[in-house]
Amino acid sequence: MTPRRPLRRLAAILGCTIVLSAAMPAFADDVAGDWLFDTSKFADNDCQISGRITFTQTSVKNTYNCVFESEQICGKLNFDLYIRVQQNCTAQRIGKQVAIKSSVGKILEVRPAGQSTSYLADNFIVQLSSNKQEMNGSHYDEQRQLKARFWRDVELIG
């Protein structure tokens, strides 16, 4: 092997790294910004919770205020129940763990009409992935614990 080959290989690897890093958005903070989320199914595998959450860094390191809108969508087994809720939350990151504690701000929509208008706040304990593009862990409320997944809400460039 000639001395130039290792340099060429290193240059190729460096070039690929630069191209890939340019394709990924830069996040000044591990958590701040917009994320989408969903949970595993529940209620006889008929319902699921999903939503969009925005984290804003506070003056306290690794602490965030957050707001989100969640939707609980159920199928026929649960009378096609649909609940859309606005929630407020605080989040704290310790290492890779992120704990999100929420409170229901307002129930925005319930279908079918006449269904119960109560909703339990969606709380989460998740772990930030090493690429800072995803968080996985648990959703919990007073009735259940579910798997939860968060991913960055990044618009694709077309």
Regions found by a protein language model. Give the residues of each.
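Beta-turn initiation residues at beta-strand->coil junctions
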Residues: 39-40, 69-70, 102-105, 138-142
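Bacterial N-terminal signal peptides
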Residues: 11-22
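A charged, solvent-exposed segment within the mature domains of Sec-exported extracytoplasmic proteins
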Residues: 120-158
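N-terminal helix-cap/turn-to-beta initiation motif at the start of protein domains
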Residues: 25-36, 55-59, 127, 156-157
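N-terminal secretory signal peptides that target proteins for export/translocation
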Residues: 1-7
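Contiguous, well-ordered beta-strand patches that form the walls/edges
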Residues: 69-130
